């Protein structure tokens, strides 16, 4: 082997070897235990960022480790290739989304290969290819035939900049998640999939996901939002109309003082027809923010409709108000207001001088003070007629039962989860396979006309979708009847909801999935991706799997057994203030910094001499210009160093702070491993280790080696604490570096240790380990080598170090045989002269012995 560690030579050669040998290509093999490891597929934005590198390194480490355990490991990769950014980039670069996307895929594919990820490239998919989305279109038509798909006009979150609909989850603080433009409300026809039909399953099956992070499961539970309550019907004075509301607090029903309805509710619209001021208010509400966080904090506004509802139990007339905080899409578009016991109702009632009636006693049994705020805690009913004195549960049931008995109430389980709106008014997406015939009938595209192909050779004007702008594209016939194709495209979450299943049979042409392959590989054993996908992608991913199961395409209930959510990658962020007061962000690569003796940044300037403000560590992003290009780091240090730093610098699920000094440290460590192996191999051939004749020092070193193997095995396999696994190997390397190399036995032990170290590091740093394995004379390629197994016998301690205390104070430490009795330990302690002087002339009154650890002699 060469004397110097040169990653640029090693990595190119090893990657070429993997490519030629197709090392990571797999097929179904019933004789082997399978393991499917999957990282969330990337959007081909043009360049990999450090977040990608972290995600894919974690997946690759797990995959390589599982291969070494002898499993048949599938690790595929592909491209989530549709989506809005491609349209913007195409306009900006005067091209079309397709060529821009395919160029990016090619570039990023090469970047992934440079990092040495062990993917089965034969299974690569791009979701924008017709051979992928044809099956998505086919499945949608099947869901339509099953009654799982419908179209309705609904108020949507509309981004006026991107000219598209946003899901509620994509509205952040009232603005578009992508471009930060203020979101508006708009009524348009949309296609929906009935995810609400699966709400109960999606909720209950979270309990089966024992190896998913608790945080993700909690977020999904809250998003599904199961509640038990009562649907209540109110009559409306002088009207045939009925008003229906849902409440989870029927115990407060005697405290209702008004009813609030959405601006778009039929009663609001009826009243607005003769009330111009109300009509203006209804129009204003059309642009109300709809993200829940916004709803909670925005100013509550309303207007009396002049209509009244009748309380079903008391007969009281309750004013009906149109309010901006009630949404037509949620529940019935009407809520009963109990201002005494609901914060939002109290705020509204206080603003508009509506009555506030307390009906629940305070915890101390007194009437609550409602002058400053509502009392929202549960308690004993009062002011509630026949229900006075009942506790919360009894009050809930008694009032619910009475409403049911009177025929004006019905117990109901409700969910916060809404049906999934999958229509997008964009071009670069899979066309929705539906046709409107000339008589107005809507039918699915026949199977023999699938896929409905998206034309790729288009001109982007940045305003309208090319397929909407071209009247010819939509024209088609179904069974000889002319019709128009749907020009909306699918939400891109559709593609990423089933890609994991298509990886099991990407070339299969006879259907969406090959049942044999899908059921061999599925469910995914390990899924890796960011926590930011907890409620969108990961919910749709689980939902789609259940749809596939119910269509007979897979036979498992959940798509992934184990989920690891990696933390974000942070980097230093610097800026200076421009002439117009704006912040101009400067890359940390271009910042010249001064640090204090604790390493803290005290001063920074850029090359032009601007004094920089240090904004701390923040997520690597384009907006703060603090991304570090992985390719630059790979060229400077090698892929193995970058991978090692990524896995060592922080626990996988925590944020990782990018520090180039840490990268240099990882590089120095690999050079040390290389140097130790070089020095060892330079001494020539090694004889076999004779375990029976090891010296005490050699036994101790071998014990450390096998304890390290046991720890690293547990850390990588069960605990997934990869940083502590690497730390354990580093600690062992320090001991190996100090170990004598005089005798044949010394060298034989070093050979055993280095072969184990190289295998333990292989999942993290595969290129250098491939070379070292060859240099050390390992059998075959390391790619097929088994994971090292800890020798239980080697780990048995021959002796123990026992701390000796006299009256609770440490007076000495003694080495005793591992199987020494308490009496033998006491005798040995008495011979230790540091201990003996404290026992001279005193009586031992009590002995406390913790076997193999501590001896405390109480004397007097």
Swiss-Prot record:
Pfam families: Anticodon_1, tRNA-synt_1, tRNA-synt_1_2, tRNA-synt_1g. Keywords: Aminoacyl-tRNA synthetase, ATP-binding, Cytoplasm, Ligase, Nucleotide-binding, Protein biosynthesis. PROSITE patterns: AA_TRNA_LIGASE_I. It is found in: Cytoplasm. SUPFAM superfamilies: Anticodon-binding domain of a subclass of class I aminoacyl-tRNA synthetases, Nucleotidylyl transferase, ValRS/IleRS/LeuRS editing domain. GO terms for molecular function: aminoacyl-tRNA deacylase activity; ATP binding; leucine-tRNA ligase activity. It catalyses: tRNA(Leu) + L-leucine + ATP = L-leucyl-tRNA(Leu) + AMP + diphosphate. GO terms for cellular component: cytosol. It comes from the Bacteria. Its EC number is 6.1.1.4. ATP binds at residue 622. A motif ('HIGH' region) lies at residues 42-52. GO terms for biological process: leucyl-tRNA aminoacylation. A motif ('KMSKS' region) lies at residues 619-623. Belongs to the class-I aminoacyl-tRNA synthetase family. HAMAP family: Leu_tRNA_synth_B (MF_00049_B). This is Leucine--tRNA ligase. The gene is leuS.
């Amino acid at each position: 082997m060469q004397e110097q560690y040169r990653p640029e030579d090693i990595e190119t050669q090893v990657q070429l070897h993997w490519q030629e040998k197709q090392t990571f290509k797999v097929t179904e093999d019933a004789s082997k235990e399978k393991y499917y490891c999957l990282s969330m597929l990337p959007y081909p934005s043009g360049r990999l960022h450090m977040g990608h590198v972290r995600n894919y390194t974690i997946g690759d480490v797990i995959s390589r480790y599982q291969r070494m355990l002898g499993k048949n490991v599938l690790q595929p990769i592909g491209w989530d290739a549709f989506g809005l950014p491609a349209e913007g980039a195409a306009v900006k670069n005067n091209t079309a989304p397709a060529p821009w996307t395919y160029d990016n895929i090619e570039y990023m594919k090469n970047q992934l290969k440079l990092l040495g990820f062990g993917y089965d490239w034969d299974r690569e998919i791009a979701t924008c290819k017709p051979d992928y989305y044809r099956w998505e279109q086919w499945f949608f038509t099947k869901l339509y035939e099953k009654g799982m798909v419908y179209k309705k006009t609904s108020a949507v979150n509309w981004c006026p900049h991107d000219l598209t609909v946003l899901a509620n989850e994509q509205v952040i603080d009232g603005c578009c998640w992508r471009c930060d433009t203020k979101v508006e409300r708009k009524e348009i026809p949309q296609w929906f999939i009935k995810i609400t039909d699966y709400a109960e399953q999606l909720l209950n099956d979270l309990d089966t996901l024992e190896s998913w992070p608790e945080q993700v499961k909690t977020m999904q539970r809250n998003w599904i939002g199961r509640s038990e309550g009562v649907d209540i019907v109110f009559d409306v004075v002088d009207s045939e109309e009925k008003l229906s509301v849902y409440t989870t607090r029927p115990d407060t029903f005697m405290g209702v003082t008004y009813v609030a309805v959405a601006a778009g509710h039929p009663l609001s619209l009826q009243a607005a027809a003769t009330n111009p001021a109300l009509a203006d208010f209804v129009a204003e509400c059309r642009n109300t923010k709809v993200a829940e966080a916004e709803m909670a904090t925005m100013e509550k506004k309303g207007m009396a409709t002049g209509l009244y509802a009748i309380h079903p139990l008391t007969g009281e007339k309750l004013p009906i108000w149109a309010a901006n905080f009630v949404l037509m899409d949620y529940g019935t578009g009407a809520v009963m207001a109990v201002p005494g016991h609901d914060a939002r109702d109290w705020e509204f009632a206080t603003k508009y001088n509506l009555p506030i009636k307390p009906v629940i006693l305070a915890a101390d049994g007194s009437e609550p003070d409602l002058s400053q705020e509502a009392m929202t805690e549960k308690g004993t009913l009062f002011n509630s007629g026949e229900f006075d004195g009942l506790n919360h549960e009894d009050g809930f049931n008694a009032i619910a039962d009475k409403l049911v008995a009177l025929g004006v109430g019905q117990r109901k389980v409700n969910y916060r989860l809404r049906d999934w709106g999958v229509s997008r008014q964009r071009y670069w997406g899979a066309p929705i396979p539906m046709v409107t015939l000339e008589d107005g009938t809507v039918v699915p595209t026949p199977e023999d006309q699938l896929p409905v192909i998206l034309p790729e050779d288009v001109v982007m004007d940045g305003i309208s979708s090319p397929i909407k702008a071209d009247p010819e594209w939509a024209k088609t016939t179904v069974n000889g009847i002319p019709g128009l194709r749907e020009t909306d495209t699918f939400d891109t979450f559709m593609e990423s909801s089933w890609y994991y299943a298509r990886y099991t049979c990407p070339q299969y042409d006879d259907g969406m999935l090959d049942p044999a392959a899908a059921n061999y590989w599925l469910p995914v054993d390990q899924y890796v991706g960011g926590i930011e996908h907890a409620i969108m992608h990961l919910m749709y991913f689980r939902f789609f799997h259940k749809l596939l199961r119910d269509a007979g395409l897979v036979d498992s209930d959940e798509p992934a057994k184990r989920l690891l959510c990696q933390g974000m990658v942070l980097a230093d962020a610097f800026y200076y203030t421009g002439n117009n007061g704006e912040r101009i962000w400067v890359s940390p690569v271009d910042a010249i910094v001064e640090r204090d003796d604790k390493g803290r940044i005290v001063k920074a300037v850029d090359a032009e001499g601007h004094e920089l403000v240090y904004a701390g560590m923040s997520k690597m992003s384009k907006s703060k210009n603090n991304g570090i290009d992985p390719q630059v780091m790979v060229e400077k240090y090698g892929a193995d160093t970058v991978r090692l730093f990524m896995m060592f610098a922080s626990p996988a699920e925590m944020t990782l702070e990018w520090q180039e000094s840490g990268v240099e440290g990882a590089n120095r460590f690999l050079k040390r491993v290389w140097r130790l192996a070089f020095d060892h191999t330079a001494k020539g051939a090694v004889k076999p280790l004779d375990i029976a004749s090891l010296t005490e020092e050699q036994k101790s070193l071998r014990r450390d080696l096998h304890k390290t193997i046991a720890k690293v095995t547990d850390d990588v396999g069960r605990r997934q604490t990869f940083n502590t696994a690497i730390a354990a190997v580093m600690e062992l390397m320090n001991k190996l570096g100090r170990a004598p190399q005089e005798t044949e036995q010394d060298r034989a032990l070093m050979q055993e240790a280095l072969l184990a170290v190289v295998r333990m590091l292989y999942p993290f740093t595969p290129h250098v380990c491939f070379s070292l394995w060859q240099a050390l004379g390992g059998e075959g390629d390391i790619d097929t080598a088994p994971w090292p197994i800890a020798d239980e016998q080697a780990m048995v301690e021959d002796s123990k170090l026992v701390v000796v205390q006299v009256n609770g104070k440490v007076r000495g430490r003694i080495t005793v045989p591992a199987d020494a009795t308490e009496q033998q330990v006491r005798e040995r302690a008495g011979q230790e002269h540091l201990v003996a002087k404290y026992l001279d002339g005193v009586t031992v009154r009590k002995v406390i012995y913790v076997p193999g650890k501590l001896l405390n002699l109480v004397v007097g």
